Design a protein with these regions (language model features):
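Hydrophobic secretory-pathway targeting helix
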Residues: 2-39
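Electrostatic cytochrome c docking/interface patches
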Residues: 30-54, 71, 126-151, 171
Length: 263
């Protein structure tokens, strides 16, 4: 007892007791805050998913089925992931304006919050590609324009043309222009393969290489005539027309000159 009393009268006893008391209170508050925050986040997530389900039932289920299992006119959405929904809905391709051969890009029908809710709901159906975060899309820091140009020419140019302006495909389909497309949507298209586009998994094209492709596309946007003279921008036939007119004109001119010389 005397030893305990002596410790209590020590000069450092009061500061030490105060320190441990504050430490205990702080630790208790941190644990309680973390628990409350986790519960709040979980509740918010549940609300978002339910909102997405209601949007799906009203705007998507007539084509994709009540359980997103798909139908004769629309594919299943099970396993497509949040990235696919964010791309299709965020670019206005879905819902489709009409049942044409290909979904065209247009102004989105749903706002950002509704799109996020719809993506969150579809993501709960089965695992699939997630929406890339801002830290994953820093193409200016992590991408290489030179590497991106080479990758684009090897993997993308045969459909989107070497300047990313788009081009015709078979059966009335087309590869859209990549000019003016958000980096997030370019990335999502590569990992989900919308419509006729193949899926470029991380094993085929790594995340860093995807950022390089995006960086090259963004650099191409700044160059108005990436392929040289625009020839009036009336379509690819202008090059062939110019070749035929100049070529035939020169041949006719040479023929006339030779005929006159023979006389």
């Amino acid at each position: 007892m005397k030893r305990i009393s002596r410790y209590r009268r020590h000069k450092a006893a009061a500061p030490l007791l105060l320190f441990f008391a504050l430490l205990t209170v702080g630790a208790t508050f941190s644990v309680a805050s973390a628990t409350t925050s986790a519960e709040t986040t979980s509740a918010d997530r549940s609300v978002q998913i339910e909102e997405g389900r209601q949007i799906f039932l009203k705007g998507c289920s007539s084509c994709h089925g009540l359980n997103a299992e798909g139908a004769q006119i629309a594919p299943s959405l099970i396993g497509v992931g949040a990235a696919s929904v964010d791309f299709q809905v965020g670019t206005g391709r879905m819902p489709m304006a009409d049942m044409s051969t290909q979904a065209m890009r247009k102004d989105p029908i749903y706002n950002a919050e509704e799109t996020a809710a719809l993506a969150a709901y579809v993501a709960t159906l089965a695992p699939g590609p997630a929406i890339p975060g801002e830290s994953e899309l820093n193409f200016e820091r992590d991408g290489s324009t030179a590497e991106g140009g080479e990758l684009f020419r090897n993997n993308c140019a045969m459909c989107h043309n070497f300047a990313g302006q788009g081009g015709a495909l078979t059966q009335g389909k087309y590869a859209p222009t990549l000019m003016g497309v958000e980096p997030k949507h370019i990335y999502e298209a590569m990992v989900t393969g919308p419509q006729s586009m193949p899926v470029f998994s991380d094993k085929t094209i790594t995340p860093e290489e995807k950022l390089s492709i995006i960086k090259w596309i963004k650099s191409a946007e700044k160059e108005p005539n990436l392929g040289g003279a625009s020839l009036g921008r009336v379509g690819p036939v202008t090059e062939g027309l110019l070749g035929w007119v100049l070529g035939l004109g020169m041949l006719i001119g040479v023929a006339v000159w030779l005929a006159m010389k023979a006389r």
